[in-house]
C-alpha cells in the first residue's frame, strides 16, 4: 500500500487495554486520514476490542486487531509496530486518550522526512511528540516506561505544520490511583540497570512530583540537571527544582535563586522567570518582580523547543504579572497600557479577563 510523498498512505498504530470509555473519540479524530490500522490489545477485560472492530467495519477501513500479553511499554509497542511496518508509507502513533484536531478534509501530504513531530496540548502545556514515522527506516521503541522512538540510521524530524493533538490522562493508565507510585518503582529498578539513563532519571523526578513527594522530587530533578545532556530537559529540571522549593515553602531567596538559575541556563525560555516574578508578587517584592520581567514581556515562544512549553506565559501571563507589579510601584500609565492590551486578547480565561478589566478600571 504505497503512494507518492504528495499522497502517502497512513497506518494507525496503537496499543490498548480497557479503553472502552474513551477509544471512540480517538478513532473518530483520525478515521479520515488513515488507510489501514494495526492495533494490539494487551489484555482488555471490557468491550474495547468489539468497539474497535465495529467502528472500522462501519467506516469500511481495513486493518488488524491483535492480542499480546503485557510485558512493558517498549516491548508491546514494538510488537504492534512490526506488525504494521509493511502496511503503509507512514505509521501514525496514537494513544487511546489522544484526540487529533485538524482542519476539515485533512490528509497528511508532502511527507518525505524520516519522522514528524506533531504539536500536543495537555492543559496549558504545549510540547511536540514524534507521532509519524516512515516505515522504511528501522524504528524501534525504547524504554520500559515513558517510551520513545529511536532509529539507528540518520533521519530528520520537523514539526508537521497542520493539526495538533489534545492529550489527556483519561485512558485506563491515567485512571490508576497508584500510577505514580507504580512508575517510581519501575523507574528505580530501570535506573539500577541503566544508572546513566537521563530519561529514566527525569521521569523518576516527574513521578515523585506528580505523587506529591516534592522533597524527593527536588532531589531527583537536581540529579537529572547534574547529568547534563538535552538542554531542554536540563532547563525544565532546574525549573522544577525551584517550583518544588516553592511548594515546600523554602525561604524566598532560595526559591528565587533556583528559578533564576534555570532561567539563565536557557534564557529563551520564560517559564522559570515568570514563576520568579509570580513569587516576587506573592511576597510583596513588586519592584524586584517588575525589574526581573519588564524586558521579557515580548519574548516569543521558542520556535524549536519542544518540551513542555507554557504558551500562555509567552502570550499573556508575563505581561499580566508585570502589569500588576507596575501598578503596585506607581507606574500606573504603564500598567494601564498593559492591562488594556490584555483586555483585548481573545484567548484569556474568562475569570482572568474579568480580573484584568477590573484592574484596568483602577489604573
Spans of model-derived segments:
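Conserved donor nucleotide-binding strand/loop of the catalytic core
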Residues: 50-79, 83
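"A position-specific structural signal for the A-helix of alpha-solenoid helical repeats
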Residues: 203, 240, 275-278, 321, ...
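A conserved acidic beta->alpha catalytic loop
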Residues: 29, 39-52, 69-70
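Acidic helix N-cap motif at the loop->helix transition within catalytic regions
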Residues: 24, 46-55, 103
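Short, well-formed alpha-helical segments that are part of the catalytic scaffolds
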Residues: 14-36
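Residue at a conserved register position within TPR or TPR-like alpha-solenoid repeats
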Residues: 208, 245, 276-280, 326
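Catalytic-site signature of metal-activated, phosphate-bearing donor transferases
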Residues: 1-2, 9, 74-82, 88-94, ...
Amino acid at each position: 500500500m504505497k503512494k507518492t510523498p504528495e499522497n502517502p498512505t497512513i497506518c494507525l498504530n496503537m496499543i490498548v487495554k480497557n479503553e472502552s470509555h474513551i477509544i471512540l473519540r480517538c478513532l473518530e479524530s483520525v478515521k479520515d486520514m488513515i488507510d489501514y490500522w494495526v492495533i494490539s490489545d494487551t489484555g482488555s477485560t471490557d468491550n474495547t476490542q468489539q468497539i474497535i472492530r465495529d467502528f472500522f467495519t462501519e467506516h469500511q477501513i481495513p486493518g488488524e486487531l491483535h492480542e499480546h500479553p503485557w510485558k512493558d511499554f517498549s516491548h508491546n509497542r514494538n510488537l504492534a509496530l512490526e506488525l504494521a511496518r509493511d502496511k503503509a508509507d507512514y505509521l501514525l502513533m496514537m494513544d487511546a486518550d489522544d484526540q487529533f484536531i485538524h482542519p476539515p478534509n485533512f490528509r497528511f501530504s508532502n511527507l518525505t522526512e524520516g519522522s514528524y513531530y506533531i504539536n500536543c496540548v495537555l492543559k496549558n502545556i504545549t510540547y511536540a511528540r514524534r507521532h509519524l514515522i516512515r516505515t522504511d527506516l528501522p524504528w524501534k521503541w525504547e524504554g520500559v516506561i515513558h517510551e520513545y522512538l529511536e532509529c539507528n540510521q540518520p533521519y530528520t524530524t520537523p514539526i508537521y505544520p497542520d493539526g495538533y493533538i489534545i492529550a489527556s490522562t483519561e485512558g485506563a493508565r491515567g485512571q490508576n490511583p497508584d500510577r505514580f507510585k507504580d512508575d517510581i518503582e519501575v523507574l528505580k529498578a530501570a535506573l539500577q540497570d541503566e544508572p546513566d539513563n537521563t530519561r529514566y532519571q527525569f521521569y523518576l523526578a516527574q513521578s515523585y512530583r506528580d505523587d506529591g513527594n516534592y522533597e524527593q522530587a527536588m532531589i531527583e530533578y537536581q540529579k537529572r540537571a547534574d547529568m547534563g545532556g538535552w538542554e531542554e530537559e536540563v532547563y525544565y529540571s532546574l525549573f522544577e527544582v525551584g517550583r518544588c522549593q516553592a511548594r515546600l515553602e523554602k525561604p524566598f531567596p532560595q526559591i528565587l535563586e533556583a528559578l533564576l538559575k534555570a532561567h539563565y541556563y536557557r534564557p529563551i525560555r520564560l517559564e522559570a522567570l515568570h514563576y520568579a516574578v509570580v513569587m516576587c508578587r506573592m511576597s510583596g517584592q513588586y519592584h524586584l518582580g517588575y525589574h526581573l520581567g519588564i524586558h521579557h514581556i515580548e519574548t516569543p515562544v521558542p520556535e524549536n523547543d519542544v518540551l513542555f512549553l507554557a504558551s500562555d506565559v509567552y502570550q499573556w501571563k508575563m505581561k499580566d504579572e508585570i502589569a500588576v507589579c507596575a501598578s503596585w510601584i506607581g507606574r500606573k500609565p504603564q500598567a494601564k497600557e498593559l492591562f488594556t492590551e490584555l483586555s483585548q486578547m481573545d484567548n484569556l480565561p474568562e475569570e482572568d479577563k474579568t480580573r484584568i478589566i477590573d484592574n484596568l478600571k483602577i489604573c
